Amino acid sequence: MSLPWRLTRDASLRNRNTFGVEARAPWLFELDDAAALADLLARPELAGTSPLVLGGGSNLLFAGDAESPVLALANAATRVLAQDSTRARVRAEAGMPWHALVMWSLQQGLCGLENLALIPGTTGAAPIQNIGAYGVEVGEFVHAVEAWDRDEGVLRRLDRAACAFGYRDSVFKHAPDRYIVTAVELDLLRAPAPRLEYAGLGEELAAMGIADPDASDVAEAVIAIRRRKLPDPAVIGNAGSFFKNPIVPVALAEELQRQHAGLPVFRGDAADNRKISAAWMIENCGWKGYRDGDAGVAASHALVLVNHGNASGMQLLMLARRIAESVATRFGVAIEPEPRIIGARW
């Protein structure tokens, strides 16, 4: 009987991270059925280790090799669990590509995820980072996350509150060696409720001649904007936005706006703070379009670090550190990376 996983020793991870940097893993396990996870974790190759769980590789930077075995979940089933006239609860397994899930939901007549179209990566990775774009975060729609708890040796179901979602944050991000996300349950809407707070989204829809958009229209606009602004990882290595927008006290945001005319400021995650544009600060430090060897910053978007071909992860990390130092020097604000960094510290 064939095993529900595939095993590769001394595996290259170049094609498993969207930066396209070379890194190796002592073992790579590809798992087709999350039900076999407990048996897999009991294998001698994984005994006493904390395997690195790898989704689409779109939210990490290998600054060195993976010291522990790597586990890739390939389970990708999706189904509607329950529904009524206003909502539907959907269960998607961790290996389902995120954009494919968004498009599947639209085909089912379900709304809510359209602003998150074309985000790379897998569904299992989405709640870890609490992915967000164009005014929407996935945590708003999560009903529960199913995850293997390595500390307890059991499969757990964490409701939205237990996930502790924040800006690009969750309980899973703070305990990367504890949880392996196996599936996500989402509560989606039956009727369109367009979220058009992001100015560029409304402008894109207007340019498309759409005054009363449905969810598919919004997704089409988001896809057009992303394709125009963000380089395709299949063409040039990148992980999308590399830096988070810093959240600062209201008083500091107002002072920065007085000192730096044009600095975009957005609503924060609480009444007493604001989110300021990392892209604007990076661009005004002169980094947009910068290149040092094969490590660089996209000419189309200052938040995106790119691998022009043969940059190492460490070269990209060193560039990111230089960018952060220049922003701190000029604006007095610390910017932090979105991707998880493997093989080095930030």
PLM ranges: what are they?
Residues I323:
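Phosphate/pyrophosphate-binding loops and the adjoining catalytic core of nucleotide-dependent enzymes
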Residues A36, P97, R274, L319-A320:
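Residue-level preference for nonpolar/small residues embedded in alpha-helices
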Residues S2-E152:
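Anion-binding (especially nucleotide phosphate/pyrophosphate-binding) glycine-rich loop
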